C-alpha cells in the first residue's frame, strides 16, 4: 500500500475552521471523473483490530479532503479533514480519537468497534481555475469480519409434538444477514418452522423427530461469513395426560371412604396430587399408597370436595389431569328459624322461614303443636289470633344421607289488637 506519512500539524475543529470548510463546500461543482477508489486493508477486520481505508488514484493539485462517517455531509458526521497547504488536520464531532488521516487521503481506524461499521464518505477538493474548486464524493462501507455465531435455545429438551422452542443466532450483528440450516440443508419454511423479520430468531412449533435438528445458523456480510456449531434438540417422549379414577363420586360426610387413583401406571413417573390448585399437604387424615399414585380419604368432609388433580412427572417436567370434584353428601344441620322474635299481637301476619345446610337440599315441613301444617321452607298465617299461640316446629330431612333434624319455637299471641 506504500509508505504513509501523517501531516505534522493537527487541530480540533474551530469556528474559523468551520468557516473554511463551509467556504470549500460552497464552491463544490459536479464530481470529478477521476477513478478514485477506496479499499479496506485488511479486507476482513475483526473487532479490536486496525483497518486502513486506502485511497487509490488520488488526483493531483489538491486543496484538501474531508472524511465523513455515513453519507450525510454535515457537521455532526464530520470526522476529520486535511488541508494540503500547511499540512493541517482538523477534527470534527464524529472524531473518536482513533482515526488518523494521512497525506494520501487514507484513513486509519484503530481498535475497531461495531460502532465503526457502516458507510464513510470522502470528499476531495481539487484546485480550480480561480473561480472555485472541483470536488469528488466517494463512499465506502466498512464491514467487520463476522464472529463465529452460537445458537441459544429457550428449551433444549422439548416434549415431542407439544412444546414450542425458540432458537436465536448470537450475537446480534449490525449490517449482517442470518441464514439457518437444518440437517445440512437450507431451512424449509412450514407452519411449524417460522423465522423472525430479521431471520435471527427461529420459532419451532410442536417439535418432532423431523424438526429436532441438527440446526446451524450463519452470519454473513459482504466480506465474510461464519457458521455456528450444530445444535440438536433432545426430544423428550410425550407424557400421556393422566386421568383420575375414583370409587365413589358421591361420598357421605364422615362416613364413606373415597379412593382416588392416578392413571396410567408407570414406574418411570412420579405422582403429585393437587387440591384447589395447591399441592396437597401431608396430613394424617390423608393416606397415600403405591408411590403416591393412590390417594385415600378415610372420611370425607364437606370442605374436601375439591377439585382434585393428579400430575405425572419425569425429571424434565410434568402434566396434570383434568380436575375432579366430589359431590359430598352431608346434612341436614340443625335448622334455623327466622325471625327470632316470638311475641305477636292479634291481627298481625305471621311469617316464619326455616333453613338448614344440606347437600342435596333438605325437605322441609312445619308442625304446630305436633300437628302437620305444610311442606316447604316458609310458613305464613295472616291475621293471627290467640288461638295461633303454640309450638311451631321445622323438621328437615335429607333422603341421600338418611339424616333428619328439627328446630322449634314457641309463639305467643296476645289478645290486644293493633289500632
From Swiss-Prot:
Q: Which SUPFAM superfamilies does the UniProt entry name for this protein?
A: Immunoglobulin
Q: The Ig-like C2-type domain covers which part of the protein?
A: 147-234, 240-327, 335-410
Range of residues in the leader sequence: 1-34
Domain Ig-like V-type per the UniProt entry, residue ranges: 35-144
Q: Which PROSITE patterns match?
A: IG_LIKE (PS50835)
Give the sugar-modified residues: 61, 104, 111, 199, 209, 268, 303
- Motif Cell attachment site — list its residue ranges: 127-129
Q: Which GO terms describe its cellular component?
A: extracellular region
> Which InterPro entries does the record match to this protein?
CEA_cell_adhesion, Ig-like_dom, Ig-like_dom_sf, Ig-like_fold, Ig_sub, Ig_sub2, Ig_V-set
Q: What is its main location?
A: secreted
Q: Which UniProt keywords apply?
A: Disulfide bond, Glycoprotein, Immunoglobulin domain, Repeat, Secreted, Signal
Q: List the disulfide bonds.
A: 169-217, 262-310, 354-394
Compartments annotated for it: namely: Secreted
The UniProt entry's GO biological process terms, in alphabetical order, are: female pregnancy
Lineage, top-rank taxon, reads: Eukaryota
Q: Which family does it belong to?
A: Belongs to the immunoglobulin superfamily. CEA family.
Record's protein name: Pregnancy-specific beta-1-glycoprotein 7
List the top taxonomic levels of the source. Answer: Eukaryota, Metazoa, Chordata, Craniata, Vertebrata
**Gene name in the database record:** PSG7
Amino acid at each position: 500500500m506504500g509508505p504513509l506519512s501523517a501531516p505534522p500539524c493537527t487541530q480540533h475543529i474551530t469556528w474559523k475552521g468551520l468557516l473554511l470548510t463551509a467556504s470549500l463546500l460552497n464552491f463544490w461543482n459536479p464530481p470529478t471523473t477521476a477513478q478514485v477508489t477506496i479499499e479496506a486493508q485488511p479486507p476482513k477486520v475483526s473487532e479490536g483490530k486496525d483497518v486502513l481505508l486506502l485511497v487509490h488514484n488520488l488526483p493531483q493539485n489538491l486543496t484538501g479532503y474531508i472524511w465523513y462517517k455515513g453519507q450525510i455531509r454535515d457537521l455532526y458526521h464530520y470526522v476529520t479533514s486535511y488541508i494540503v497547504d500547511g499540512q493541517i488536520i482538523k477534527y470534527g464531532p464524529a472524531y473518536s480519537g482513533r482515526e488518523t488521516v494521512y497525506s494520501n487521503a487514507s484513513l486509519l481506524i484503530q481498535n475497531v468497534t461495531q460502532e465503526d461499521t457502516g458507510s464513510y464518505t470522502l470528499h476531495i477538493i481539487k484546485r480550480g481555475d480561480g473561480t472555485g474548486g472541483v470536488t469528488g464524493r466517494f463512499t465506502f462501507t466498512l464491514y467487520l469480519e463476522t464472529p463465529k455465531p452460537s445458537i441459544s435455545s429457550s428449551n433444549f429438551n422439548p416434549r415431542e409434538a407439544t412444546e414450542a422452542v425458540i432458537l436465536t443466532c448470537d450475537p446480534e450483528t449490525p449490517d449482517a444477514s442470518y441464514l439457518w440450516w437444518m440437517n445440512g440443508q437450507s431451512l424449509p419454511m412450514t407452519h411449524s418452522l417460522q423465522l423472525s423479520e430479521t431471520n435471527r430468531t427461529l420459532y419451532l412449533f410442536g417439535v418432532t423427530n423431523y424438526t429436532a435438528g441438527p440446526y446451524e445458523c450463519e452470519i454473513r456480510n459482504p466480506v465474510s461469513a461464519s457458521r455456528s456449531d450444530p445444535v440438536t434438540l433432545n426430544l423428550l417422549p410425550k407424557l400421556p395426560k393422566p386421568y383420575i379414577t375414583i370409587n365413589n363420586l358421591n361420598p357421605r360426610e364422615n362416613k364413606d371412604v373415597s379412593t382416588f387413583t392416578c392413571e396410567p401406571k408407570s414406574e418411570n413417573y412420579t405422582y403429585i396430587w393437587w387440591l384447589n390448585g395447591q399441592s396437597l399437604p401431608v396430613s394424617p387424615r390423608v393416606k397415600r399408597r403405591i408411590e403416591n399414585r393412590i390417594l385415600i380419604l378415610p372420611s370425607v368432609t364437606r370442605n374436601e370436595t375439591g377439585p382434585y388433580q393428579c400430575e405425572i412427572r419425569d425429571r424434565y417436567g410434568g402434566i396434570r389431569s383434568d380436575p375432579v370434584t366430589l359431590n359430598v353428601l352431608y346434612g341436614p344441620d340443625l335448622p334455623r328459624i327466622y325471625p327470632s322474635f316470638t311475641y305477636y299481637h292479634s291481627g298481625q301476619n305471621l311469617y316464619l322461614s326455616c333453613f338448614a345446610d344440606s347437600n342435596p337440599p333438605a325437605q322441609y315441613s312445619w308442625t304446630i303443636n305436633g300437628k302437620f301444617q305444610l311442606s316447604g321452607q316458609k310458613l305464613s298465617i295472616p291475621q293471627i289470633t290467640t288461638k295461633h299461640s303454640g309450638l311451631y316446629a321445622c323438621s328437615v330431612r335429607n333422603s341421600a344421607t338418611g339424616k333428619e333434624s328439627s328446630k322449634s319455637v314457641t309463639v305467643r299471641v296476645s289478645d290486644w289488637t293493633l289500632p
